[in-house]
Amino acid sequence: MNYQHYRATTLGRTLQDTLDEMMERGDITKKIANLVLLRYDKSISTALKDHGTSNMSFTAERLETFRCCDNVWTLILKDAEFREDQHSLKVDVVKIVACLGTDNGNE
């Protein structure tokens, strides 16, 4: 399963804007734009699976909200601190979306 939430990243929004402009000019059809977005979803998921090796830890003062729907967990944390090696970042509120990393071998 390829999730679409990576489309909300800067790269994903820029891709969507570019595809919208190309459709407005008549350079591509909506069907082609959708195929590009589906390929983007799959490529991002594959790249993170194959090359995402960074480790990070975090703590939070409070777990404000949590929910699970269709194997997608959403967590809202208050007063969180993220640490990686010598770097740390403190934030007032953070939203974490965690998805099932495999599709039971059906890729």
Swiss-Prot record:
Entry keyword annotation includes Transcription regulation: yes
Domain of life: Eukaryota
Main location (coarse class): nucleus
SUPFAM superfamilies: Transcription factor IIA (TFIIA), alpha-helical domain, Transcription factor IIA (TFIIA), beta-barrel domain
Keyword flag Transcription: yes
GO molecular function (one): TBP-class protein binding
One Pfam family named in its UniProt record: TFIIA_gamma_N
UniProt-listed CDD domains: TFIIA_gamma_C, TFIIA_gamma_N
Any Gene Ontology CC annotation: transcription factor TFIIA complex
InterPro entries xrefs: TFIIA_a-hlx, TFIIA_b-brl, TFIIA_gsu, TFIIA_gsu_C, TFIIA_gsu_N
Keyword tags: Nucleus, Transcription, Transcription regulation
GO biological process, one term: RNA polymerase II preinitiation complex assembly
Record's subcellular location: Nucleus
Function per UniProt: TFIIA is a component of the transcription machinery of RNA polymerase II and plays an important role in transcriptional activation. TFIIA in a complex with TBP mediates transcriptional activity.
Assembly, per entry: TFIIA is a heterodimer of the large unprocessed subunit 1 and a small subunit gamma. It was originally believed to be a heterotrimer of an alpha (p30), a beta (p20) and a gamma (p14) subunit.
Family assignment from sequence similarity: Belongs to the TFIIA subunit 2 family.
Record-given protein name: Transcription initiation factor IIA subunit 2-2
Organism name: Drosophila melanogaster (Fruit fly)
Gene behind the chain: TfIIA-S-2
